[in-house]
């Protein structure tokens, strides 16, 4: 027949809409026309496909060829369409008999020799194909990442000839081999941090409830050390979470996917990171740091050194767990549910009080003014990490609690949360907070009066309740008590610091 249809998938973030490759061969002047909003890289496929077909032992049709990539309103880029275009050409020119062609989808770039090359984002394309009941053929370069998907619906090929022989029933394509296991537990241990017991307690609460944490203190007190130990307190990703994170990572670094399997992402962008690098962007938007940190941790060291507009762009994703990127050519949603951990010095000189302070209150407030109030309001806990008192360093950290011990308490608290409300504390909405974070009447009145004195917002009220509920779970208490609220209020260092500076200015 002179018409052939082959199925493949486009690349729009982590979504993979179906693309139908239609090839029609008719009499007329020899030539190839490609329609359906193809980008330059797709238009270049005509030369790659021509050479691949000839070097695979077939002939390129010397007729009028029309190739349509439908639907036409979706932008299409990259070399992922080479393989389906080549197969459609061979079927339409009656060089390939493939009666079961519509049971498969194909993605892959072709070398001039006909060899298959991998493409970015194969995981999400394979998952979408499997959902509609079709098997998908990918290149050997993508074997490891699609091997993370359970089942035998993904088939691996190394050359155009192998795919053609498979469709004719002369060759069997195998699914990915080898079982991927979670990476080794080689996280840094919290016991390496000398002193800072309140900081370790805050880290335990953050790990149990999925809360956001701001660490403040002079240089060299252990803020970054504490933050880097958080992944060692968290459970590994579930299979569903791991696939979500792997699908995002495969868009930018496919070779790193299997090494990160079931490990919580830990992203630490430099303060010079641009808005595009942080949230994602491009003419067809690529994922940014907040999406690469999905289901994991985003650590921002030297927080005030980031551009203010970059930090304020995080406000919506922190609340919604996703980022919407709207560009002229494409509008894409990326998941971005992460824990935000930040560290900062309290002043431009590193200290804001005591004998080491070299900054005036005006200079310190100007420095903190780089952080907007709504952004600071997104932190559930803020804690000062002070210089260690005399005698702590000389003891050399003897008797410090290890991460393995703390992890047991964290896992138990998370299990209690999931059994009660089927989600982490940090993900509760306002309606669920009323149900799961109830207070006694006198405690509610006391908390409201306290927040009024501190000038805190309704969002701060809700975050305090969630932190107090996590503390109660860690203590194995059924209800939120006054001492849980008091401990939650003790983790509001940024509010106390701002009030102190404003008092000095008065």
Predicted feature descriptions by range:
Residues 217, 280, 302:
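The Walker A (P-loop) glycine that initiates the GxxxxGKT/S ATP-binding motif of P-loop NTPases
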Residues 295, 301-303, 313:
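Walker B catalytic acidic pair
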Residues 35-46, 61, 68-78, 284-285, ...:
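Basic, amphipathic alpha-helical bundle interface domains used for macromolecular binding and assembly
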Residues 168-205, 209, 237-290:
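P-loop NTPase nucleotide-binding/switch module
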Residues 215-255, 320:
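Walker A/P-loop
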């Amino acid at each position: 027949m002179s018409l052939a249809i082959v199925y493949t998938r486009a690349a729009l973030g982590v979504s993979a809409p179906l693309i139908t490759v239609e090839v029609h061969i008719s009499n007329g002047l020899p030539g190839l026309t490609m329609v359906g909003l193809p980008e330059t890289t797709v238009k270049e496929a005509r030369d790659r496909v021509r050479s691949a077909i000839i070097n695979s032992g077939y002939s390129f049709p010397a007729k009028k060829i029309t190739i349509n990539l439908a639907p036409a309103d979706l932008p299409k880029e990259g070399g992922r369409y080479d393989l389906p275009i080549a197969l459609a050409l061979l079927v339409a020119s009656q060089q390939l008999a493939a009666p079961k062609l519509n049971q498969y989808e194909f993605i892959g770039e072709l070398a001039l020799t006909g060899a298959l090359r991998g493409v970015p984002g194969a995981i999400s394309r394979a998952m979408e194909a499997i959902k509609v009941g079709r098997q998908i053929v990918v290149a050997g370069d993508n074997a490891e990442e699609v091997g993370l998907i359970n089942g035998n619906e993904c088939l691996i090929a190394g050359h155009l000839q192998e795919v053609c022989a498979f469709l004719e029933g002369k060759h069997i394509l195998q699914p990915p081999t080898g079982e991927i296991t979670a990476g080794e537990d080689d996280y840094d241990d919290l016991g390496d941090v000398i002193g800072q017991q309140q900081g370790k307690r805050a880290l335990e609460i953050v790990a149990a409830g999925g809360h956001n944490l701001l660490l403040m203190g002079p240089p060299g007190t252990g803020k970054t050390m504490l933050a880097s130990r958080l992944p060692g307190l968290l459970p590994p990703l579930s299979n569903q979470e791991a696939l979500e994170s792997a699908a995002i990572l495969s868009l930018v670094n496919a070779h790193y996917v299997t090494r990160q399997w079931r490990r919580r992402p830990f992203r630490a962008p430099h303060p010079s990171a641009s808005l595009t690098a942080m949230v994602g962007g491009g003419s067809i938007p690529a994922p940014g740091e907040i999406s690469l940190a999905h289901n994991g941790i985003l650590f921002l060291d030297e927080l005030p050194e980031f551009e203010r507009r970059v930090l304020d762009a995080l406000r919506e994703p922190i609340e919604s767990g996703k980022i919407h990127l709207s560009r002229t050519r494409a509008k894409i949603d990326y998941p971005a549910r992460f824990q935000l951990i930040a560290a900062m010095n309290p002043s431009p000189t590193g200290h804001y009080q005591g004998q080491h302070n070299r900054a005036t209150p005006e200079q310190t407030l100007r420095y903190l003014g780089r952080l907007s109030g709504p952004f600071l309001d997104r932190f559930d806990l803020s804690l000062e990490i002070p210089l260690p008192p005399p005698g702590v360093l000389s003891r050399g950290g003897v008797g410090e609690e290890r991460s393995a011990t703390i992890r047991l308490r964290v896992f138990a608290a998370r299990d209690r949360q999931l059994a009660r409300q089927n989600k982490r504390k940090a993900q509760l909405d306002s309606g669920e907070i009323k149900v799961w974070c109830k207070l006694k009447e006198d405690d509610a009145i006391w908390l409201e009066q306290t927040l009024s004195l501190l000038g805190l917002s309704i969002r701060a009220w809700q975050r305090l309740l969630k932190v107090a509920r996590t503390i109660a779970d860690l203590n194995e208490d059924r209800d939120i008590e006054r001492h849980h609220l008091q401990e939650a209020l003790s983790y509001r260092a940024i509010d106390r610091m701002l009030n102190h500076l404003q008092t000095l200015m008065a």
